[in-house]
């Protein structure tokens, strides 16, 4: 694996053809309209893309370590247990402490592409 990789991110967003997209499997709470692609990693950081269609949902989940999500395209809400929600839009960056339950809900007609990075060891442990 190379230490660096260029992903096209022009005016139309990330080139979806650079990755192998995998639909998220429903867990206890169903995910729908969501796909995940692993782009690779270097220096202990894994890079993933999450595609969330308008109205799509990524079910509530946790990551073992801190995770950072940059919203590349689209918008929606992050939801938490107890009903709390945070709205997000293109250009926002959201950080989650480890083991904080949260989920994603697409809100616009556009597809959301989010780039998420977190320690590679936590990705392997969760798999």
What role is predicted for each listed range?
Residues 42-45, 53-56, 75-77, 120-123:
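Short, charged/polar surface micro-motifs in flexible loops or helix N-caps
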Residues 82-99:
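Short acidic-glycine-tyrosine-enriched beta hairpin
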Residues 68, 95, 109-125:
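A short hydrophobic beta-strand segment most commonly corresponding to one strand
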Residues 49, 72-73, 89-90:
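A cytosolic small-molecule/anion-sensing beta-strand core signal
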Residues 53-62, 67:
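Catalytic core of non-heme Fe(II) oxygenases with the double-stranded beta-helix
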Residues 64-77, 81:
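Glycine- and acidic-residue-biased ligand/ion/polar-headgroup-sensing regions
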Residues 58-60, 78-79, 96, 101-108:
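Short beta-strand His + acidic residue motifs that chelate non-heme Fe in jelly-roll/DSBH
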Residues 1-44, 48, 59, 126-127:
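A short, N-terminal "cap"/entry segment at the start of jelly-roll beta-barrel domains
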């Amino acid at each position: 694996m190379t230490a660096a990789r260029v992903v096209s991110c022009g005016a139309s967003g990330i080139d979806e053809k650079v990755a192998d997209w995998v639909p998220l499997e429903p867990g206890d709470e169903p995910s729908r309209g969501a796909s995940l692609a692993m782009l690779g990693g270097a220096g202990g950081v894994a890079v993933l893309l999450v595609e969330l269609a308008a109205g799509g949902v990524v079910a509530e989940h946790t990551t073992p370590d801190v995770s950072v999500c940059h919203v590349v395209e689209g918008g929606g809400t992050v939801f938490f247990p107890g009903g709390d929600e945070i709205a997000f839009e293109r250009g926002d960056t959201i950080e989650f402490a480890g083991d904080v339950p949260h989920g994603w809900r697409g809100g616009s007609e556009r597809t959301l592409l989010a780039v998420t990075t977190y320690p590679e060891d936590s990705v392997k442990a969760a798999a």
